[in-house]
Design a protein with these regions (language model features):
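Conserved hydrophobic/aromatic packing and binding residues within compact polymer-binding modules
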Residues: 131
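Beta-propeller domain segments
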Residues: 1-100, 104-108, 134-147
């Protein structure tokens, strides 16, 4: 059933049941990461990062116990609220080579994100209780940030 809209099993679906027309709105953003789920987000309102990040969403993807996920993606939004292409903003939390066929368990698993009063981002980990501070270094008036 390619491109079909189905009701999830946790909401009474059976893998074939479609919702009534108009019952659900179309999602603004979808994430198609294998074995990874968006678990938290923050819309950036600070001024410590370049203006291109203002109003966009930083989304935490929580990976499974294999090589997928474990990162923070950025989704820009235009003035009309339309999302742009999402891109990985911060990665490396898993602390293993993602190209490995059997990488083993991840060292860290991002679970939450917040914007601090200083405009930095704070990412929390569910594996070891660590919190990372991500701050922009350079002139925030420049158009793009480097990782």
């Amino acid at each position: 059933m390619k491109n079909a809209r189905l009701i999830s099993p946790e909401y009474g679906g059976d893998g074939r049941k479609s919702p009534a027309p108009g019952a659900y709105s179309t999602p603004v953003v979808t994430f198609h990461s294998r074995r990874s789920a968006p678990v938290d987000l923050v819309f950036y309102s600070g001024k410590a990062f370049p203006g291109a990040y203002r109003g966009g969403a930083f989304v935490v993807l929580h990976g499974t116990q294999n090589k997928y996920g474990y990162n923070v993606v950025f989704v820009p939004f235009d003035r009309n609220g339309k999302p742009g292409a999402q891109a990985v903003f911060a990665d490396g939390f898993a602390a293993f080579d993602p190209s490995s066929a059997t990488p083993g368990p991840a060292r860290y698993r991002p679970i939450g994100i917040a914007e601090g009063p200083d405009g930095a981002l704070y990412v929390a980990d569910s594996q070891k209780g660590r919190i990372w501070r991500i701050a922009y270094q350079g002139d925030p008036s420049r158009r793009t940030a480097s990782r």
